[in-house]
C-alpha cells in the first residue's frame, strides 16, 4: 500500500523512515516533506502545504490508502474530519479532540471540569486583569500563549518584571499573533516532567512504548 505523511519536520522524517521499513508499504509520500525525507528509500516529497487540507484529501484519494498527520495545525483545522467525510483512512484526532493541543485554555478548562489534577491557573484576554493576577500570585509563574506558537509560546518567569513583560508582549505586543490573543497564567511547579503517550480510538487504549 501507499502511505501519505503530512508535515515537514523531523517528526515526519522519523515517521516516513519507519513506515517505509514495513514490507507492506510500497511508497511513502511526504507533504511537503524536507531535504531529509527526499533522500529516504521508498519516500517522495509532494509539494502540498500542510494547511491545504482539500488538496491533501484530493491527493490521498488518488494515490494512497492511509494518511498519517504529524503537525498540530492541520489537525486543529480539521484535516481528519475532512478525510473521514470523504471515506479516506487517516490517523489523527478530530478537530474537536485536537483542541487539547491547539488551545491551552481549552485544555486547562477541560482538566478542571473533569477534576483532573493540574496547576492552578487563570485565562486572560486583557492586560490589566492579567497584571493584577500576576501581582497577587507573585513569581516564579508561568505565562502561556493560548494557541499554537511553534513550541515557543511558554515563558517561565522567575521574576514579576519578567512575567509582566511576557503578558504585555503577548496580549498587546502581538508577540505570537492570534496564538497570544489569550494567555494562560499558571502556577509554577518544580519537578521532573514526564509524558505517557497512547493511541486511542474512543474505546481502546494502546501505549506506544
Locations of the language-model features?
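Short beta-strand-to-turn element immediately C-terminal to the catalytic PLP-Schiff-base lysine
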Residues: 7, 124, 155-159, 199-201, ...
Amino acid at each position: 500500500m501507499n502511505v501519505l505523511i503530512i508535515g515537514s519536520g523531523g517528526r515526519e522524517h522519523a515517521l516516513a523512515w519507519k513506515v517505509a521499513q514495513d514490507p507492506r508499504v510500497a511508497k511513502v509520500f511526504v507533504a511537503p516533506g524536507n531535504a531529509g525525507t527526499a533522500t529516504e528509500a521508498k519516500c517522495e516529497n509532494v509539494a502540498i502545504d500542510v494547511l491545504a487540507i482539500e488538496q491533501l484529501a484530493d491527493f490521498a484519494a488518488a494515490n494512497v490508502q492511509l494518511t498519517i498527520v504529524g503537525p498540530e495545525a492541520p489537525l486543529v483545522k480539521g484535516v481528519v474530519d475532512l478525510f473521514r467525510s470523504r471515506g479516506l483512512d487517516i490517523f489523527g484526532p478530530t478537530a474537536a479532540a485536537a483542541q487539547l493541543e491547539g488551545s491551552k485554555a481549552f485544555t486547562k478548562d477541560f482538566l478542571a471540569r473533569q477534576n483532573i489534577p493540574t496547576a492552578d491557573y487563570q485565562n486572560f484576554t486583557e492586560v490589566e486583569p492579567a497584571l493584577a493576577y500576576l501581582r497577587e500570585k507573585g513569581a516564579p509563574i508561568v505565562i502561556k500563549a493560548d494557541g499554537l506558537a511553534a513550541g515557543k509560546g511558554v515563558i517561565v518567569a522567575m521574576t514579576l518584571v519578567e512575567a509582566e513583560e511576557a503578558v504585555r508582549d503577548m496580549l498587546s505586543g502581538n508577540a505570537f499573533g492570534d496564538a497570544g490573543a489569550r494567555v494562560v497564567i499558571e502556577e509554577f511547579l518544580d519537578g521532573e516532567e514526564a509524558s505517557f503517550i497512547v493511541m486511542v480510538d474512543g474505546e481502546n487504549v494502546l501505549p506506544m512504548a
